[in-house]
C-alpha cells in the first residue's frame, strides 16, 4: 500500500490541479512544484516547495532543465523495501517521492495549429516530464504516477481511505506508459510528416479509445472504436441509436463515396458495397434515382448525401427502413421529420473533402499493409478511344460517371449507368463475365433497362466473353483500364458489336 507523504506536481494541463493540491496540503502531503504550476499553487494559498530549492540546483537553459536531477529521480525510483536503496538515499539525503502528477507540454496541440514553426514545435517537446513519468511508472509499487486530471477524484478517495493498493497503482502505471508512448509517437509522426516520409522505416501508431461498441461484426465478437492522434473525428451524431461496428463501416463507405462525387450525390450502402449512386440538381431526385437501382438491397442501408437534406428528402427517406444517413447538412424541418423515427442514425459532416483519410491500413496475420487511398482521378484527356465508333460529348459524360462509380464496388466490379445514375451493379464476383451478367440481371429484376447504358469495369477484360455479354445486354459504351494481353481481341469484339470503348490506363481493384 502506497502512503502519500510527498508529491511532485508539474502540469501543463492545469485542470482541477488547484483543488487536488489543496486536498494534498490538507492531508499533510508535502508538495514540490515547478514553474507555472508552482506559481498557480502559491497564488491559491497552497504550500509548495520550488524545485530548485528542493534540489539545490537552479532551473537552467530557459527552463529546459528543471527536474533532471538525482534528488528527483532517486526519490521516484527508490525502492523503500530495498535496504541498499534506503541506505543510499539516506546517505545522499534523497527523500522518497510517493506521488508524481505530471502531464506534458502540449506538443500535439501546438503542431495542430496552422502554420506552426519548427522552433515552436521543438520548444513544446517535453523532456523532464516523460522522464519523471517513466521513473515513477517503473517504480509503480512504491510511487504513484498520475497523468490525467480525470483521475484526481478517484485518488483523493483512495488517499482518504488509507492509501493506494499495488493493483490500483499498476493501472495508473499502464496508463502512464501509454501516455509517454503516445507522446513520443506524436513527435515522431510529426517530424516524419514534415519530411514527407509517408512510409517510414519504423512505423509508430497511436490511437485513442473513443468508445466501446456493443459488439463487433457479429454479436459474439467484442469491439471498440479508436481515433488516431492527428485526426479528430468531425462526424457529428444528431440522433439515433448508438453506432455499431457494421454501421461505422457503412457510414465510412457512404462518406468516402459521396465526398468524391459531384454535389448532390446520393449513394446507398449495404455491407460496404454501393447498391445505388446518383447525382442531380436536387438531392431528392438523386435519392430516388439511387434507390431505384436496387430497392431491395437498399432496405436497411446507410445513405450518404453530399448536400443538404431538406424536408421532402427526409420524408422520402423515412418511408423506408434505413439504418442511417450521413450528410453535409440537415435542415431544421428535416430534423423534425427524422425525430419521429428516433432509431435512424443521423450524422452531419460539413466539409466532406477535407476530412478524407490519406492512408488505408489493412492488418494481416503477420503484419500491417499500408497503401495510399485510391483517390486518383482521371479527366477526359486521359481517355483513349480504342474502337471505330467514337463517343459523343454526352457519351463521355456518361462514361466518366460510370468510371467514378466503379472504383467503389468490390472487385470484380461492373456497373451499368445512365449519365448520372446507376442502373445495375455487379459486385464481388470471381469472374468478370459473371459480374457483367449479374449487373444486367439486377437491373432487369427491378424493371430497369440497360439498353443504351454506359458500363465501367474496374479492371481489364481478360477475354472477349465479357464484351459479348455486354453487347447482348444492350450496352452502348464501355470504359475500362485496358492492359490485357488480349486487348486486341477485346477491341475486335467491341467493333463487331458496334460498341464504343475507351481505355483509362488506370485500374481500380477493390478487395
UniProtKB/Swiss-Prot annotation:
PANTHER family: BIFUNCTIONAL PURINE BIOSYNTHESIS PROTEIN ATIC (PTHR11692:SF0), BIFUNCTIONAL PURINE BIOSYNTHESIS PROTEIN PURH (PTHR11692). GO terms for molecular function: IMP cyclohydrolase activity; phosphoribosylaminoimidazolecarboxamide formyltransferase activity. The IMP cyclohydrolase activity resides in the N-terminal region. This is Bifunctional purine biosynthesis protein PurH. It comes from Leptospira borgpetersenii serovar Hardjo-bovis (strain JB197). PROSITE patterns: MGS (PS51855). SUPFAM superfamilies: Cytidine deaminase-like (SSF53927), Methylglyoxal synthase-like (SSF52335). Pathway: Purine metabolism; IMP biosynthesis via de novo pathway; 5-formamido-1-(5-phospho-D-ribosyl)imidazole-4-carboxamide from 5-amino-1-(5-phospho-D-ribosyl)imidazole-4-carboxamide (10-formyl THF route): step 1/1; Purine metabolism; IMP biosynthesis via de novo pathway; IMP from 5-formamido-1-(5-phospho-D-ribosyl)imidazole-4-carboxamide: step 1/1. Belongs to the PurH family. The gene is purH. Pfam families: AICARFT_IMPCHas, MGS.
Amino acid at each position: 500500500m502506497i502512503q502519500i507523504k510527498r508529491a511532485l506536481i508539474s502540469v501543463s494541463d492545469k485542470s482541477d490541479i488547484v483543488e487536488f493540491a489543496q486536498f494534498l496540503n490538507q492531508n499533510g502531503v508535502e508538495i514540490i512544484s515547478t514553474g507555472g504550476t508552482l506559481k498557480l499553487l502559491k497564488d491559491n494559498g497552497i504550500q509548495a516547495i520550488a524545485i530548485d530549492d528542493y534540489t539545490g540546483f537552479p532551473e537552467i537553459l530557459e527552463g529546459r532543465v528543471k527536474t533532471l536531477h538525482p534528488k528527483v529521480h532517486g526519490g521516484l525510483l527508490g525502492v523503500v523495501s530495498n535496504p541498499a536503496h534506503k541506505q543510499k538515499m539516506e546517505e545522499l539525503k534523497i527523500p522518497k517521492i510517493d506521488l508524481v502528477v505530471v502531464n506534458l507540454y502540449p506538443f500535439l496541440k501546438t503542431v495542430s495549429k496552422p502554420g506552426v514553426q519548427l522552433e515552436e514545435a521543438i520548444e513544446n517537446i517535453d523532456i523532464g516530464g516523460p522522464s519523471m513519468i517513466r521513473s515513477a511508472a517503473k517504480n509503480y509499487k512504491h510511487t504513484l504516477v498520475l497523468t490525467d486530471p480525470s483521475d484526481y477524484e478517484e485518488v483523493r478517495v483512495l488517499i482518504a481511505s488509507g492509501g493506494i493498493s499495488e493493483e490500483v497503482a499498476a493501472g495508473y502505471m499502464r496508463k502512464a506508459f501509454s501516455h509517454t508512448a503516445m507522446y513520443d509517437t506524436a513527435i515522431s509522426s510529426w517530424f516524419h510528416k514534415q519530411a514527407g516520409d509517408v512510409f517510414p522505416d519504423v512505423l509508430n501508431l497511436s490511437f485513442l479509445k473513443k468508445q466501446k461498441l456493443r459488439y463487433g461484426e457479429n454479436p459474439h465478437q467484442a469491439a471498440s472504436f479508436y481515433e488516431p492522434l492527428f485526426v479528430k473525428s468531425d462526424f457529428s451524431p444528431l440522433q439515433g441509436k448508438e453506432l455499431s461496428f457494421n454501421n461505422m463501416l457503412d457510414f465510412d463507405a457512404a462518406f468516402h463515396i459521396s465526398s468524391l462525387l459531384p454535389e448532390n450525390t446520393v449513394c446507398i450502402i449495404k455491407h460496404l458495397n454501393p447498391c445505388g449512386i446518383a447525382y442531380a440538381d436536387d438531392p431528392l431526385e438523386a435519392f430516388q434515382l439511387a434507390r431505384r437501382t436496387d430497392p431491395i438491397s437498399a432496405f436497411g442501408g446507410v445513405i450518404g448525401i453530399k448536400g443538404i437534406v431538406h424536408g421532402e428528402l427526409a420524408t422520402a427517406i423515412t418511408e423506408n427502413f434505413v439504418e442511417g444517413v450521413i450528410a453535409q447538412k440537415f435542415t431544421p424541418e428535416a430534423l423534425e421529420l427524422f425525430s419521429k423515427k428516433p432509431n435512424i442514425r443521423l450524422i452531419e459532416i460539413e466539409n466532406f473533402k477535407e476530412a478524407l483519410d490519406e492512408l488505408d491500413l489493412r492488418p494481416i496475420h503477420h503484419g500491417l499493409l499500408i497503401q495510399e487511398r485510391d483517390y486518383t482521378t482521371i479527366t477526359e484527356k486521359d481517355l483513349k478511344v480504342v474502337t471505330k465508333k467514337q463517343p459523343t460529348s454526352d457519351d463521355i459524360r456518361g462514361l466518366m460517371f460510370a468510371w467514378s462509380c466503379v472504383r467503389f464496388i468490390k472487385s470484380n466490379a461492373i456497373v451499368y449507368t445512365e449519365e448520372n445514375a446507376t442502373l445495375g451493379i455487379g459486385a464481388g464476383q470471381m469472374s468478370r463475365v459473371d459480374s457483367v451478367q449479374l449487373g444486367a440481371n439486377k437491373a432487369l429484376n427491378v424493371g430497369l433497362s440497360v439498353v443504351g447504358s454506359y458500363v465501367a469495369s474496374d479492371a481489364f477484360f481478360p477475354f472477349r466473353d465479357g464484351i459479348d455479354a455486354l453487347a447482348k445486354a444492350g450496352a452502348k459504351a464501355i470504359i475500362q483500364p485496358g492492359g490485357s494481353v488480349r486487348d486486341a481481341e477485346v477491341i475486335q469484339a467491341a467493333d463487331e458489336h458496334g460498341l464504343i470503348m475507351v481505355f483509362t490506363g488506370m485500374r481500380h481493384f477493390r478487395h
